[in-house]
Amino acid sequence: VPQTPTTTIDEALEAFLADQRERLSARTLRNYEDVIDLLRHCLNGYGPNALDEPERKRWEEAYEDDEEAFCHLFGPEYILSEVSEFLGYFMVRKVMAGQDLLRSAGTVTKKLANWLHEHGYAGEDARDLAVDRGATASRDLPRAERLANLLYEQSLATATVNRAALSSRDIVGQDLPLQIERVEPGKLYFIDVDGPLRVPREASDLAKPGWDVTITLIRQRGTWKVLEVGNVYPR
């Protein structure tokens, strides 16, 4: 694809997929198409946040008639700046994805970053950052999803409680995600939480310090229990 000022995000993503069609199996190609479709949704939803005032006005006018205006208006130089949002938030919070698609999200991001650089749409630094982020996501997104499932299973064993009757010292995580501070076999320690959460060994094997977990913990008879759990965000 020759680089021209008129190449849009949408056109670049289509050209990337066209190149992949020549070399990928049908099943793998479907994963690529699914990931690129999700990336488009992410770009259209969150990309405008990075626009300066004149560009944002232009986008707002176009958006009135076209919800995908961001990808139709702006060039591919905007793609890689959204990779962290896409892999770190969007794929976790907004997408019900299986292990295969979660792994593919990182792989496709790496391939796309290299392709954008080869075609003159991204600099070396942007490519390197996106490739690194993609490699980490391929490994960590499936792990984080498995950990979230294990914590959810653990929450099912916690009896219903009257939150109003709990001391503020005995309930944490209602307002903000908790960050894993350290991991020991069968134990997760969270920042600003006094004492460990005991978990199955499989869960502690998956977890990593620095990951954020949307989770509510309650302390009963000196032991932390999982009351509710949402997502695990690898960092």
Residue ranges and their predicted role:
Residues 151-185:
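Structural detector for short beta-strands of small beta-barrel domains
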Residues 1-20:
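Generic N-terminal leader/targeting and pre-domain segments
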Residues 25-117:
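Non-catalytic DNA-binding core/recognition domains of DNA-processing enzymes
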Residues 114, 205-231:
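Flexible glycine-rich surface loops and low-complexity tracts that mediate binding to linear polymers
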Residues 192-209:
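Beta-strand/loop nucleic-acid-binding surfaces
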